[in-house]
């Protein structure tokens, strides 16, 4: 996995690449507002932070044994928390089981179901198209918030949707069953 700072850096680099491909001829942003405006100009609506754990064991998973390649407690904690994601201003609907937070930056929604029970379609270079668990990861919210454009009154007029889609190693998926 990659930590939130590295992911944020990669999103910025990807944005610069997209802006160059679109020939936006924009200078490299220096402020949060400039980064958010460039994201808006590029027309980006969604950011997927996708991870696929491809590690595998030489021996089969034993029955009644929980297997994971990193912290079992951390994995279970992420898996039982409600799914949470940055919610874009272009989204004109919300899932029936979605809720908004009463406090905070206003960039996120959460679903009334655990992340380990929520699948999203995404893409990883190692496997291509895949389904991942929509688990809570702070960078999903901090990135959506960072790239929010607000009007003079402080109302969000642009924000990309951002979520983290995690596909654990196959033995960890079996352990969840």
Predicted regions mapped to residue ranges:
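C-terminal catalytic/substrate-binding lobe primarily of soluble NAD(P)-dependent oxidoreductases
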Residues: 17-177
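Domain-scale recognition of functional cores that engage charged ligands
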Residues: 1-13
């Amino acid at each position: 996995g990659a930590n939130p700072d590295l992911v944020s850096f990669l999103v910025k680099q990807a944005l610069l690449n997209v802006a160059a491909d679109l020939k936006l001829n924009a200078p490299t942003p220096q402020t949060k507002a400039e980064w958010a405006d460039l994201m808006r100009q590029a027309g980006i609506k969604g950011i997927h932070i996708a991870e696929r754990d491809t590690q595998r064991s030489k021996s089969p998973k034993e029955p009644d044994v929980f297997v994971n390649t990193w912290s079992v407690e951390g994995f279970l904690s992420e898996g039982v928390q409600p799914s949470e994601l940055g919610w874009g201003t272009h989204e004109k609907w919300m899932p029936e089981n979605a809720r908004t937070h009463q406090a905070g930056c206003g960039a996120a929604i959460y679903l009334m179901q655990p992340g380990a029970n929520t699948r999203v379609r995404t893409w990883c270079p190692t496997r291509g198209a895949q389904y991942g668990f929509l688990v809570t990861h702070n960078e999903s919210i901090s990135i959506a918030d960072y790239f929010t454009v607000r009007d003079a009154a402080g109302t969000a007029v642009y924000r990309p949707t951002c979520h983290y889609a995690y596909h654990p190693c196959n033995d960890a998926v079996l352990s969840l069953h």
